[in-house]
């Protein structure tokens, strides 16, 4: 997304630039990253086999099984979700069903996705007061599994990239890494919900904002 914006600097071909024109700032607290819908309930209720969920920074996963696992030193009575990441179907994640350390939620609905796309211009930047804490705040924002957090990171890093280019500098490797991570999370979930290839998500968002 940001690469496309940079290529078209000065003559953006789609209205997605409205998202990044509004240079606002969040406070340092990641507590502000909360979906309007009641996502807190997701970790209070069991997910079901076959459901798609977002698990931490691992992106969208499908619940393949809910079972006990026999691992030395573990509580054999503890239940685990066996998760299959969409981007790595051969991979497996064993997540305790009562795990409060890693954010888990159901994927958003199509209606919620369309609403969030419409709200993108109003989503604020991530305000980083202490440069030494920048990477930590990026990590914490990504780990919230919050759609708005991903968009906030993208907007923040776009402006940083723009400022560095104006100074004759390149984007830092740290910023580049988290920009790609946020875009991957954003497009990955939208792709599943809207039934479109990830590569088409940017154009889809543009069309929605132009409508």
What are the roles of these predicted feature ranges?
Residues 97-211:
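Charge/polar-rich, low-complexity and marginally structured segments
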Residues 59-69:
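Short beta-strand-centered aromatic/proline hotspots
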Residues 69-80:
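Short, solvent-exposed secondary-structure boundary/capping segments
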């Amino acid at each position: 997304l940001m690469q496309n914006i940079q290529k078209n600097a000065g003559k953006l071909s789609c209205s997605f630039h409205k998202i990044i024109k509004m240079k606002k700032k969040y406070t340092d607290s990641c507590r502000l990253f909360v979906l309007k819908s009641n996502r807190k309930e997701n970790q209070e209720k069991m997910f079901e086999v076959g459901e798609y969920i977002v698990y931490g920074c691992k992106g969208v996963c499908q619940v393949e099984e809910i079972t006990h696992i026999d691992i030395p030193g573990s509580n054999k009575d503890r239940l685990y979700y066996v998760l299959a990441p969409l981007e790595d179907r051969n991979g497996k994640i064993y997540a305790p069903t009562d795990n409060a350390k890693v954010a888990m939620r159901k994927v958003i609905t199509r209606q919620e996705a369309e609403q969030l796309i419409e709200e993108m211009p109003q989503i604020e930047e991530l305000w980083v007061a202490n440069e030494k804490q920048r990477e930590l705040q990026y990590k914490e924002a990504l780990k919230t599994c919050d759609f708005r957090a991903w968009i906030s990171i993208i907007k923040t890093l776009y402006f940083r990239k723009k400022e560095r280019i104006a100074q004759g500098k390149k984007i830092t490797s740290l910023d580049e890494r988290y920009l790609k991570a946020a875009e991957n999370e954003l497009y990955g979930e939208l792709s599943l919900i809207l039934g479109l290839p990830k590569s088409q998500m940017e154009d889809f968002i543009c069309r929605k904002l132009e409508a």
